Amino acid sequence: MFTLKKTLLLLFFLGTINLSLCEEERNAEEERRDGDDEMDVEVKKRFITGLIGGLMKALGK
């Protein structure tokens, strides 16, 4: 029983470190891609406008 607890504690500890490192790497990548956010906003606006236009055509108005 003690060995199982020890193993589970070790796995939990290593998993926590791994998640922390991945989160730091993801944050660094997001900081590098700051310019892409403006492009994403434009694409979302076009998508919403196209979606509304398509719904209006489908409804026949």
Curated annotation (Swiss-Prot):
GO cellular component: extracellular region
Propeptide feature: residues: 23-44
Modified residues (Lysine amide): 61
Gene Ontology BP, a term: defense response to Gram-negative bacterium
Tissues with expression: Expressed by the skin glands.
Keyword Acetylation applies: no
Pfam family, one: FSAP_sig_propep
UniProt cross-references to InterPro entries, sorted A to Z: Frog_antimicrobial_propeptide
Compartments it resides in: Secreted
Signal sequence segment: 1-22
Keywords for the protein's UniProt record, in alphabetical order: Amidation, Amphibian defense peptide, Antibiotic, Antimicrobial, Cleavage on pair of basic residues, Cytolysis, Fungicide, Hemolysis, Secreted, Signal
Domain of life per record: Eukaryota
Role of this protein: Antimicrobial peptide. Active against some Gram-positive and Gram-negative bacterial strains. Active against fungus C.glabrata 090902 but not against C.albicans ATCC 12231. Shows very weak hemolytic activity against human erythrocytes.
Family membership: Belongs to the frog skin active peptide (FSAP) family. Temporin subfamily.
This protein's name: Temporin-SN2
Organism, scientific name: Sylvirana spinulosa (Fine-spined frog)
